[in-house]
Amino acid sequence: DRDSCVDKSRCQKYGPYGQCTDCCKKAGHTGGTCIYFKCKCGAESGR
């Protein structure tokens, strides 16, 4: 889920990050972005 992606995907302060995006996609989101070193998932896909 969204929170597990935050825990697994440490990242730079801002911008896209591969692990973050991949984690979010597996969780059913369209992708993810890094905000203040945390992975934030985008809108859910296919719902």
UniProtKB/Swiss-Prot annotation:
**Which keywords describe this protein according to UniProt?**
Disulfide bond, Ion channel impairing toxin, Knottin, Neurotoxin, Potassium channel impairing toxin, Secreted, Toxin, Voltage-gated potassium channel impairing toxin
**Short name of any one Pfam family annotated for the protein:** Toxin_17
Disulfide pairs here are 5-23, 11-34, 20-39, 24-41
Gene Ontology MF terms: potassium channel inhibitor activity; toxin activity
Would you tell me the Gene Ontology cellular component terms? extracellular region
Where does this one sit in the cell? Secreted
UniProt xrefs under InterPro entries: Ergtoxin, Scorpion_toxin-like_sf
Coiled coil spans:
none
Q: What does this protein do?
A: Reversibly blocks Kv11/ERG potassium channels.
The entry's free-text remark on domains says: The presence of a 'disulfide through disulfide knot' structurally defines this protein as a knottin.
Q: Which protein is depicted?
A: Potassium channel toxin gamma-KTx 5.2
Identify the species of origin. Answer: Centruroides gracilis (Slenderbrown scorpion)
Q: What phylogenetic lineage does the species belong to?
A: Eukaryota, Metazoa, Ecdysozoa, Arthropoda, Chelicerata
